[in-house]
Amino acid sequence: YFVCGFQVVFIGVHMPSYLKDNGLTPNVATTALALIGLFNVIGTYAAGSLGQRFPKRYLLSGIYILRSVAIVVFLSTPLTPWSVYIFASVMGVLWLSTVPPTNAVVAQIFGVQYMSMLAGFVFLSHQVGSFLGVWLGGKLYDATGSYDIVWWIAVALGVFAALINLPVREGAIARPASPAGAAA
């Protein structure tokens, strides 16, 4: 979830400046952000539905690897308003689509009794990733005059997240039985 925060907040905050630096108008950037928001609704709903039918670890791995592929394609193609709009639409579908399967995996593994607290811890990692995506984006831009390094870090983190989700066991963890007569 750290990676989700890093990727989406880096893009949400720094993409407008990236586009401006590459000669595109603010209108392209605002349209891109609007498309991300629009397609996010579709992607998040679809991820929740797919997570009820397929293993969530594969769904999460797919989302993270597709984000990395989308970024690589975006960086590898000529930057035009239409390439930005296509990228924004694809990223929108993938934007917060990690939320339903991530929370579902937490509930499956740990149960729902402490779901609010556990979801809070998971969300904290998202926020730490968000901070680092924004901060590192600005820091490296100031140091190099380019966002290239951070884009590639986002790609690498997406591949890493895809790989570490694959071995996740989605069943409840084994807990020792309570001793007889112990208060619940």
Where are these regions (language model features)?
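Multi-pass alpha-helical transporter architecture, strongest
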Residues: 155-184
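Extracytoplasmic gate region of multi-pass secondary transporters
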Residues: 1-47, 99, 133
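Interfacial helix-cap and linker-helix signal at transmembrane-aqueous boundaries
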Residues: 19-20, 50-51, 136-145
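C-terminal transmembrane helical hairpin of 12-TM major facilitator-type secondary transporters
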Residues: 10, 34-40, 46-105
